[in-house]
Amino acid sequence: MGALTIVAKYMIVAQIEVNGSVDKSDIIGALFSQTEGLLGKDMDLRELQMMGRIGRIEVDIFEKNSKTKAKIYIPSNLDRYETALVAALIESIERVGPYLANIKVLEIKDLREEKRRRIIEKAKELVKMIEEEILPDTKEIIEKLKEDVAKAEIVEYGPEKLPAGPDVEKSDSVIIVEGRADVVNLVKHGYRNVIAIEGISRGIPQTVIDLSKKKSVTVFIDGDKGGELVLRELLKVAHIDYIARAPPGKEVEQLTAKEIAKALRNKVTLEEWLAQQKAAGEKTEAPAQPTQQQPPPAEAPIQFPFDMSKKVEEMLGTLEAEIYDANWGLVKKLPVRELPDFLTGEGDSFYAIVMDGIVTQRIVDLAAKKGVKVIVTARVGPLTKVPEDMKIITFEKLTQKVA
């Protein structure tokens, strides 16, 4: 069907069969000539076409042998009654040239309905485009705005000028992460008491170590081996209260607000984390085991001047430490949290420490400098080096040995 020459409301579709071989022009000529004057001048096809009431008549011949079959398309700008009258008019055609003919109207299409359908379909496409293209762009703009605001709030903290959130100084707790991008992501989502160590290649910054002495500390690590390495280094020198971890394979800087909230909500204490590692086969501690040489210290005979099993019962749950001299005289009793500071201070050397806490690499290093030879403890954290002349034994192994 060719292009319409008017803005039509309706389309008359008819089929014609001619008992002979004819052309398009023959069929169109028959339509005009055989309907002329039948319904008066106002309904004459030629007059209607000249006034733009009907459009260009199209004929598509689809069979032409001894008989000719074709479809006729007549666009109409008349109202529905007049259009129906024109349709009935063309059915009155009986001949095309010398051949008998028969015309049957197949349908009268409401082109406005077709147009409405196309408009609706187009509207659906546009809505889909809005959802897929415009809305994501809006979200991206909002995320970019949040990130820019977060970056503007990042401060440089301490002599090392570590990237940190604006509330690190005044908050009672602090979240330690690895890098600046992690800080930006957490600040963007409302966590303003966060500070980064900026990697572990140059060691843990003293600023972070000092913060860990006076604030509740949560270490938020990536969900990969790199995160475990960061935690291992922190445990050597800093006081760690809680550990939060990103989902496996994800980094803290990549997390959404929901993922951050879930990870921090599911944080565990250091004791719980160590127990989980032990239950999982102590995978993160396995590489350090050969250098710890813990079995020999645990099995080596240690002479105590008092019933150590009773002492263990007394200390369980107190989170305290007791410092002894070479004659097993009590020098100091203090909370385990204050033990590193006490060992750092100036003073005489000591012989033994009994503590209801976790022995970290930092405690081992400080105790070694004070000449400590025996440490009796509730738990042993990840250690990389223990002096050969230092004996470390856990409450559990001690009670088993006594039993």
From Swiss-Prot:
EC number from the UniProt entry: 2.7.7.101
UniProt entry keywords in alphabetical sequence: DNA replication, DNA-directed RNA polymerase, Exosome, Magnesium, Metal-binding, Nucleotidyltransferase, Primosome, Transcription, Transferase
InterPro entries given in the database record: DnaG_primase, Primase_DnaG_arc, TOPRIM_DnaG/twinkle, TOPRIM_dom
Entry annotated with the keyword Transcription: yes
Region of interest (Disordered), residue spans: 279-300
Cofactor binding annotation: Binds two Mg(2+) per subunit.
Gene3D superfamilies hit by this protein: 3.40.1360.10
Catalytic activity: ssDNA + n NTP = ssDNA/pppN(pN)n-1 hybrid + (n-1) diphosphate
Listed SMART domains: TOPRIM
Function of the molecule: RNA polymerase that catalyzes the synthesis of short RNA molecules used as primers for DNA polymerase during DNA replication. Also part of the exosome, which is a complex involved in RNA degradation. Acts as a poly(A)-binding protein that enhances the interaction between heteromeric, adenine-rich transcripts and the exosome.
Family: Belongs to the archaeal DnaG primase family.
Summary of subunit composition and partner proteins: Forms a ternary complex with MCM helicase and DNA. Component of the archaeal exosome complex.
Protein name: DNA primase DnaG
Native source species: Pyrobaculum neutrophilum (strain DSM 2338 / JCM 9278 / NBRC 100436 / V24Sta) (Thermoproteus neutrophilus)
Lineage per the UniProt record: Archaea, Thermoproteota, Thermoprotei, Thermoproteales, Thermoproteaceae
